UniProtKB/Swiss-Prot annotation:
Function: Confers resistance to Pseudomonas syringae pv. tomato DC3000 (Pst DC3000).
GO terms, molecular function: mRNA binding
Induction: Accumulates upon infection with avirulent Pseudomonas syringae pv. tomato DC3000 (Pst DC3000) carrying avirulence genes avrRpm1, avrRpt2, avrB, or avrRps4 but not with the virulent Pst DC3000. Induced by salicylic acid (SA). Accumulates rapidly in local and systemic tissues after wounding. Triggered by spermine, an inducer of pathogenesis-related (PR) genes. Up-regulated by cucumber mosaic virus (CMV-Y and CMV-B2 strains).
Protein's name in the database: NDR1/HIN1-like protein 3
GO biological process, one term: defense response to virus
PANTHER family: LATE EMBRYOGENESIS ABUNDANT (LEA) HYDROXYPROLINE-RICH GLYCOPROTEIN FAMILY, OS05G0199100 PROTEIN
Encoding gene, per UniProt annotation: NHL3
Tissue: Expressed in roots, young and senescing leaves, cauline leaves, stems and siliques.
């Protein structure tokens, strides 16, 4: 056996080959679009998120530009006249009512029109609803325009007044001046030039004091009343 501790004069021994070990994808990024399929959907979610952010920013910019161009002002509602010919609560809690209402709707905008697709009027005494009307026809209101609409609430309704509401009613019966709320539910769209907006549903509330017309001795005359508009 040759002496292993002796010198070796043969050909040089090549260095050992490096073995590479795959440890999967490095880093938190997902690379190009072709790598997205193997990225457990993270790339797709990132793209969708970026698209949504871009759309939101563009919509915000568009809304700002529209506002700067058109400078929208709030629509104004007034009850110009109210006529109450009956408002009687019988012992069985049936309320008989007959109320005529006239409204003015003012569009103060110079460049914005309004489509009134639906107007529903409800009558309330305290928190109790006693009547509803949706017989106002839909219409378009142009720039800087005032429109007069009217409706009638008539019929009978079971109402269950609490102690405070019954006390208020007794006071109103004695004075013959009734504290009635008219609430409007609208479906409207705005027109900006050739562009029509999506549908809005503002709520209108009018706090009224209406004299009973059969009583001519109170001397109280209905006063036109501005309504609160809540978009």
């Amino acid at each position: 056996m040759a002496d292993l501790n002796g010198a070796y004069y043969g050909p040089s021994i090549p260095p050992p080959k490096k073995v590479s070990h795959s440890h999967g994808r490095r880093g938190g990024g997902c690379g190009c679009l072709g790598d997205c399929l193997g990225c457990c959907g993270c790339c797709i979610l990132s793209v969708i998120f970026n698209i949504l952010i871009t759309i939101a920013v563009l919509l915000g910019i568009a809304a700002l530009i529209i506002w700067l161009i058109f400078r929208p002002n709030a629509i104004k509602f007034h009850v110009t006249d109210a006529k109450l010919t009956e408002f009687t609560l019988d012992p069985t809690n049936n309320l008989r009512y007959n109320l005529d209402l006239n409204f003015t709707i003012r569009n103060p905008n110079r460049r914005i029109g309004v489509y009134y697709d639906e107007i529903e009027v409800r009558g309330y005494y305290g928190d109790q609803r006693f009547g509803m009307s949706n017989n106002i026809s839909k219409f378009y209101q142009g720039h800087k325009n005032t429109t007069v609409v009217g409706t009638k609430l008539v019929g009978q309704q079971l109402v269950l007044l609490d102690g405070g509401e019954r006390k208020d009613l007794n006071e109103d019966v004695n004075s013959q001046i009734y504290r009635i709320d008219a609430k409007l539910r609208l479906k409207i769209r705005f027109k900006f030039g050739l562009i029509k907006s999506w549908r809005f549903k503002p709520k209108i509330k009018c706090d009224l004091k209406v004299p009973l017309t059969s009583n001519s001795t109170s001397g109280f005359v209905f006063q036109p009343t501005k309504c609160d508009v809540d978009f």
